């Protein structure tokens, strides 16, 4: 039986923490769908199309990873793509409470969907897209936290000029 997993998120922008989890998940599952969310309650820095394009560029070397944009319920997306695993990253204990509630809701909406929680590597445990954008907005060095392609896109989008 082939197992398809979905790794959902806003990915605004995709960080080294995200790509680490995607690479690790790609070794665990036959197919990993990186599902980039359009969330009307958030004001992303990058448009959905820009986030999908960045992710496609960064993940093209991983054969069993597919990048899509989506809106709507994750449980429905999983059903539409015959995915039975939902990958979620947990950076700290504080993330677990929300993720636990989300896993239970998704299982209620789609009983065939199981959540798998992955912890980041130690070097990525504190990285978040929000922090990366905040540092970049102040011309800080984010090269340790994102791919050079993302750093260039952030510099262009935010009008920053940091370079190493």
Curated annotation (Swiss-Prot):
It catalyses: (R)-4'-phosphopantetheine + ATP + H(+) = 3'-dephospho-CoA + diphosphate. The record marks 18 as: Transition state stabilizer. The lineage of its organism: Bacteria, Pseudomonadati, Pseudomonadota, Gammaproteobacteria, Alteromonadales. HAMAP family: PPAT_bact. It comes from Pseudoalteromonas translucida (strain TAC 125). This is Phosphopantetheine adenylyltransferase. Its cofactor is Mg(2+). GO terms for cellular component: cytoplasm. One of its GO terms (biological process) is coenzyme A biosynthetic process. Belongs to the bacterial CoaD family.
């Amino acid at each position: 039986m082939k197992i398809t997993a979905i790794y959902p998120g806003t990915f605004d922008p995709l960080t080294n923490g995200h790509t680490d989890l995607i690479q690790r998940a790609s070794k665990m599952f036959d197919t990993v769908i990186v599902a980039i969310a359009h969330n009307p309650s958030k004001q992303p820095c990058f448009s959905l199309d820009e986030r999908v394009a960045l992710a496609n560029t960064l993940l093209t070397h991983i054969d069993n990873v597919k990048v899509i944009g989506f809106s709507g319920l994750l449980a429905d997306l999983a059903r539409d793509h015959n995915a039975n695993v939902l990958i979620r990253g947990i950076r700290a204990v504080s993330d677990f409470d929300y993720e636990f509630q989300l896993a239970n809701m998704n299982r209620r909406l789609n009983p065939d969907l199981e959540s798998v929680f992955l912890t980041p590597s130690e070097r990525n445990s504190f990285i978040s897209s929000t922090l990366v954008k905040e540092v970049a907005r102040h011309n800080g060095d984010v090269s340790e936290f994102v791919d050079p392609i993302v750093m260039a896109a952030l510099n262009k989008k935010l009008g920053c000029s940091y370079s190493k």
